[in-house]
C-alpha cells in the first residue's frame, strides 16, 4: 500500500490466499508454488517486467540469490534477470554474506562497527570450546532461519547442547505440514524431505534492550532510515509488536558503514542490542529484505517508499504526509492479538490499515487459525469479539 501511494505500480508473486490479494494496492498477482519457487518468481518477472524487486521475507531473498546464480549460468539469455536482481538488492558480492551470520559479523567488525563475539559452531567440540572461551549465557542462531525461529538463548551447558542439536536438525515434516495447512506456506516441505541441516552460530550475550533499523538504500548509499527500540514482542524470539522511534547515532553509523561496504540497494533491516550498562549499540545481524515497518511514512528522511521511488525514477523524493507525531508505534495485528487490553493500543499510534477492511479481517483471521492450531482458545475468543465490534 505504501509503495503504491509513493507512485509505484505494484505486482506481486505470492501464495494463494495471501493477504495482499484482498487489498486494492496491487495491479496483479502471480502464483507462488512452494515446490517450484524459482520457476514461480521467474514467471512473475517475465510477465510483470518490473523496474525493482522487493523481497518481503528471508526466503524470497534467498530464492532471488539462487535465481541470480541460475540466470548468470545462462549467459546472455539470463542477463536481464541477473541485472534486475543486482539493481534491486545490490552488489552480487554481498549475497553470500548477508545469510552467513559469522562472516557478516566479522565484516562489520572490520568496518569498525561494535559487535558481539560470534563464531560458527559445526560440532560439539566447537560448542564446548566456545563456552570455555566466552562463557554463558550465549545466543545460538541458525543460518537460513527467520522470524526468531532459529534463535535460542542458552544459560547452561546442557541447554546449549540441546539447542545446538535442535537448531542443526532438519525441519520436522510435521512443522512443514503445519505451515502448509495453516499458513499456506509450503516452503519447509522440501527441506524437511531432503533432511537439510542448518549451520549454527554462537553469539556473545549482550544484556540490554533490543533495537532495530530499516534502511532504504541505493548502490551503497543510505537514502532514508527508521530506527526503533523494541518495547514489546509476540514472544521472546518473535517479531516486535510495540516500537519506539529513536535517533541513535551509533545505529545510524553502523547501518551506513554496512550498506556502503556491501554495496546494498533496496530495503534492508539491521538488528541491534542496546547495552544496559553503557547504552552502546551492538549490531547483531542483518535482515536482507524489508521488515514489518517498511510502510511507515514518518517524514523526510524517514519515508522509505518515497526514497526508493525517487532513486528508481530519478525524481526528487516527495515524502508522504507524516503518519503520526507519536514516537510509540503499535503494530497490527501483533499487539492487538498479543494483549487486546494493552494500554499501548490507546496511548501509541495503532497502525491499523482501516482503509483496507478486508486486510484487517485477513490479519485477524490468520491469528485465529494459528490460535486454533495451538489451542489458544481464550485469546482467540477475545480477539474475535474485538474484531467484530470494530469491523
Which ranges hold each PLM region?
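ATP-binding N-terminal substructure of ATP-dependent carboxylate-amine bond-forming enzymes
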Residues: 1-91, 125, 129, 374-375, ...
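Peripheral (often C-terminal) accessory segments that flank ATP-dependent C-N-forming ligase machineries
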Residues: 306-391
